Every structure is written in C-alpha cells, then in structure tokens.
C-alpha cells in the first residue's frame, strides 16, 4: 500500500537556528528553528528555542496554550520558578510571563495560539 501521509523528520541536533523574531525585531540572545510553527495559521505548531546565557524573553500574554519541554539548561520565570531538563510546562490561555536563563537553554515549544 502506498503511503499517502506527509512526513517531516527533524533532527534537533542538526538544525540551523535563526534570530528569534516572532514579535517583530530579533530578541538578543534568542534564536529559533521552526519545525511546524506558522504564525499565519493562528500561531499553531512547534519550534526549537535556543537562549544564550543571560538571555531574557519579552513579557507576553498567551492567547492559547503554550507548552514546552526543557531539553538543555534551565529557564527561570519572574516568580523564581526554575524549569529544568525534562520538565514539561503548560501555560494556559490568559497566562502572562517572561523568562530568562543564566547559563543558556534549549527548549522544544508547542504553540496553540499567538502570543501578544
């Protein structure tokens, strides 16, 4: 039987990262590789996010669910919560936050809505 589905395989250790510009201008110290993320389809999809040591994300509001899996390093939210390797984190719609990293991190992000 002929396979009719489309398949895409991404090796996370063999990708090219580009400056993270999801909010317009690139954010210093942040880069990404879009796996299936597409802002024009309502912000649905998956991407790899790489943050260099000392990088900080912009404060943002989640209009849909954002979930991520920590692959490398640590990520810190303003309330002091530290996300570590292996943590799977869910932010529900209506949640706002920003994050930073001391030593850098790699995160696999699953989006179900555009951040504001």
Task: Indicate residue ranges for each PLM-predicted region.
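A short, N-terminal "cap"/entry segment at the start of jelly-roll beta-barrel domains
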Residues: 1-43
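Conserved short histidine dyad/triad with adjacent acidic residue
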Residues: 31-62, 92-96
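Ligand-binding loop in jelly-roll beta-barrel domains
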Residues: 93-116
